[in-house]
Amino acid sequence: MKKIVLLLTLCSIGVCASAGIMIYPKYLSLDDKTKSAEVTLINSSALESSNYRVTLSYKKQNPDGSYTEVTNEEEIPADSVTKILRYSPRSVMLKPSKSQTVRVLKRIPEGLEPGDYVGYITFTEVLLEKAATKENLDPKAFSVKLTPIPSFSIPIFVRYKVKENAHVSLETKGLVTKEGITSLSVVMKRQEQAKSKGPRLVARGDLSVWDGDQMIGYIKGRYMLPATDTLETQMPLYIPDAITNKEGQKENKYLTADELKGKTLKVLFTQANDEQLQKDKVLAQTEIKL
């Protein structure tokens, strides 16, 4: 039997692609006072075990917000964490209803420039091959089998000898309606010149859209990597918990372009906070009249 097996990697950033696997925290952050951090994987399945290979990687952030993994070592930029972090174990076996921790250790090489360093810790499931059967040993048969490989990543931020934040500005490109959802296109631009001296920093915070005192859009934990100068974000516009469904549960009411016509909206990029939006700690802002 002639069999072609295509391995498709289902990879997401911060979101597990394999059902039954949970991860905590959703990102790692190390500063001058922090030498190590831990990631915990939990197998919520009571029946199946899972095996994962653990790697450090660098992903290029594209202007549209997507990511491209850089596999050629010569193309990995200087702001990557891959050369300043160590981790163990390199593989994880998760038994049913069990958890395991991966420890990340920071080792600063001599002469490292101050700045923000970023990367991703990636967990890729190791699929076990099934034993061959009489049917699939038929030399005259031919088939193509697509095998998805569950994989997921979380970002790692390492800040070395810097305290200031990256300076960014915000611009808007108007409304975009796709698949029935109206969004506001927001562009974040870095203020530091790409060739200027000094460290390139991560811009990290929360994005929100306001119609007067009513928040109608929110993206928590938006960040622009040091090598990125322009980052566009599509922000769905809605009124939180404005509708009660038949089951008595609150749902968001998504706004249409007609409902927003003539309104002046304010966009805020505020200091990141794990608990709640800090509207009083504004890093950048802009307005748009629709």
PLM region spans:
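Short acidic, flexible loop segments centered on an aromatic residue
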Residues: 48, 52-79, 189, 193-215
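Terminal connector regions
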Residues: 57-59, 107-161, 243-290
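Short edge beta-strand/loop segments characteristic of extracellular beta-sandwich folds
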Residues: 38-42, 185-195
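Short, solvent-exposed loop/turn segments enriched in Ser/Thr/Gly
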Residues: 31-38, 101, 113-120, 180-184
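N-terminal edge beta-strand
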Residues: 18-37
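Sec-dependent N-terminal signal peptides
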Residues: 3-17
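Short beta-strand segments of immunoglobulin-like
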Residues: 24-30, 91-92, 171-177
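Intrinsically disordered, low-complexity Pro/Gly/Ser/Thr-rich segments with frequent PxxP/GP/PP motifs
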Residues: 73-110, 213-257
